[in-house]
Amino acid sequence: MPRPTHPYVSTWQGWLYVAFVIDVFARRIVGWRVSSSMRTDFVLDALEQALYARQPERDGGLIHHSDRGSQVVSIRYSERLSEAGVEPSVGSKGDSYDNALAETINGLYKAELIHRRAPWKTKEAVELATLEWVSWFNNHRLLEPIGYIPPAEAEANYYRQLAKQVAIAA
């Protein structure tokens, strides 16, 4: 039986698995994927979405922290992180506190969406609902650790402040 906060979703067609890639600074979900299998391609798709959103070759200095799941410690996944110039960081085995932000996001996802709208019939229904939830989460969900504002606002505030500092320095 899946652990309660892990993003597994029961549907009439069987179990689905959900992967999120989260920007820790602003708590923004920058990549996600729903899959009927736990293969490496599943988490690679979420990673590719995040890499496209964040363009690490432009910004540099990115660190990817994850649990010790077989998908994220696979050779292909590690190679892709390296190609993108992203530093891998892997947590302790069985330590939910080591990846507390991911556990929190997974729990919110299940409480605010999955359990509230169950039962789920199809993968497509879960994908569409997840797309809508991620957009709502990033743009409207107030989060205490970032000052009771949504992740998109926290990120916009950071870049606005950065632009001011650059203008002052020029």
Spans of model-derived segments:
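Charged DNA-binding/catalytic regions of mobile-element recombinases
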Residues: M1-A170
